[in-house]
């Protein structure tokens, strides 16, 4: 794809998301979603092959169905309240339909089936956009309608998503599928807290985006798409191998890394709201995620793939690509725990 065309398409994707985030009128929100969806399709099909075509078609059909459900919910709400404003969601049926539409857009369970398939069929750079930027618009709408969301429905969706995100990634060897299931699990944690503390959900989303961006950039730098290709990283870029180890542990939510902050705060907030069973189940299920992150850590940093002696010095002769954004992203993805005391403003 030519650079001017790519810039124009990326600008449209960003504009669509910004329209959704800054609008309080349902029609403008719907227009923003449509702009964003139609502009992302060429990015997903950047590598023009049957697999990318299939992934783009799946993405388009899912998002179009979700947009239709969203407009149906908006129309029902309009009939009952006579208002187009996002703050005036008063009808329970309309609220439920909107919630289902937005969970479908985010890829939360039970509407998660498209996420691993689409992510696996596209390039690493497209997958990075799909699993980070594309989550912002639906989450911002959920944030705005959070007072009217059905608590039981959202809790059930959150628990199912955390379970599916952990269970689905267990036997995967494809890195993009692992990141897709990781995304489903993280979205589940955000869905659990959105009713009780929507601001905390945005903190979680920010940290998730930072960690996922860093991970995808490292995969692109080492040109890895499977756990087997990741095991060659020691020979090519030793520093990257140790960085991937730290990032995986951060994604798993282990202290003293940044990924521990949202899990800690969400469990604390849910406990304050007299919900003991839900955070307990989520914390136990998060061990499944930690297991497959540890598998990646083991294959990347703790084993050396059998190779000839001259291959072990390969890193000395390889010219590595410059990624200026990577160092600050890695630092924020792993070392933010000291700012934890400042988070008291979210209470």
From Swiss-Prot:
It comes from the Eukaryota. GO terms for biological process: mitochondrial electron transport, NADH to ubiquinone; mitochondrial respiratory chain complex I assembly. The chain crosses the membrane at residues 3-23, 25-45, 66-86, 111-131, 149-169, 178-198, 201-221, 237-257, 274-294, 325-345. Its EC number is 7.1.1.2. It catalyses: a ubiquinone + NADH + 5 H(+)(in) = a ubiquinol + NAD(+) + 4 H(+)(out). Keywords: Electron transport, Membrane, Mitochondrion, Mitochondrion inner membrane, NAD, Respiratory chain, Translocase, Transmembrane, Transmembrane helix, Transport, Ubiquinone. GO terms for cellular component: mitochondrial inner membrane. Disulfide bonds: none annotated. It is found in: Mitochondrion inner membrane. It is an enzyme of class 7 (translocase). It is a multi-pass membrane protein. One of its GO terms (molecular function) is NADH dehydrogenase (ubiquinone) activity. The keyword Transport applies. Core subunit of the mitochondrial membrane respiratory chain NADH dehydrogenase (Complex I) which catalyzes electron transfer from NADH through the respiratory chain, using ubiquinone as an electron acceptor. Essential for the catalytic activity and assembly of complex I. Belongs to the complex I subunit 2 family. Core subunit of respiratory chain NADH dehydrogenase (Complex I) which is composed of 45 different subunits. Interacts with TMEM242. This is NADH-ubiquinone oxidoreductase chain 2. It comes from Vulpes vulpes (Red fox).
């Amino acid at each position: 794809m030519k650079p001017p065309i790519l810039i124009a398409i990326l600008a449209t994707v960003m504009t669509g998301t910004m329209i959704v985030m800054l609008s309080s009128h349902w029609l403008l929100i719907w227009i923003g979603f449509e702009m964003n969806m139609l502009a992302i399709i060429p990015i997903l099909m950047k590598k023009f092959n049957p697999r990318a075509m299939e992934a783009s078609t799946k993405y388009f059909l899912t998002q179009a169905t979700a947009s239709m459900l969203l407009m149906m919910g908006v129309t029902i709400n309009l009939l009952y309240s006579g208002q187009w404003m996002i703050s005036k969601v008063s009808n329970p049926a309309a609220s439920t339909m909107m919630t289902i539409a937005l969970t479908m857009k985010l890829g939360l369970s039970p509407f998660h089936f498209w996420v691993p398939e689409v992510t696996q069929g596209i390039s690493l750079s497209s997958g990075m956009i799909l699993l980070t930027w594309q989550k912002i618009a639906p989450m911002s709408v959920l944030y705005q309608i959070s007072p009217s969301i059905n608590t039981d429905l959202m809790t059930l969706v959150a628990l199912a998503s955390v379970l599916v995100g952990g269970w689905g990634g267990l036997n995967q060897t494809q890195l993009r599928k692992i990141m897709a299931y990781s995304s489903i699990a993280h979205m589940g944690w955000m869905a659990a807290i959105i009713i009780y503390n929507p601001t905390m959900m945005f903190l979680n989303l920010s940290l998730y985006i930072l960690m996922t961006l860093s991970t995808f950039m490292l995969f692109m730098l080492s040109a890895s798409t499977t756990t087997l290709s990741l095991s060659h990283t020691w020979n090519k870029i030793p520093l990257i191998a140790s960085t991937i180890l730290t990032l995986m542990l951060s994604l798993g939510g282990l202290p003293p890394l940044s990924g521990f902050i949202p899990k800690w705060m969400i469990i604390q907030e849910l406990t304050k709201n007299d919900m003991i069973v839900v955070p307990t189940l989520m914390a136990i299920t998060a061990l499944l995620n930690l297991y497959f992150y540890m598998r990646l850590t083991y294959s990347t940093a703790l084993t050396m793939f059998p190779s000839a002696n001259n291959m072990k010095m390969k890193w000395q002769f390889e010219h590595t690509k410059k990624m200026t954004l990577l160092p600050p992203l890695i630092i924020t993805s792993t070392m933010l725990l000291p700012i934890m005391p400042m988070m008291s403003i979210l209470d």
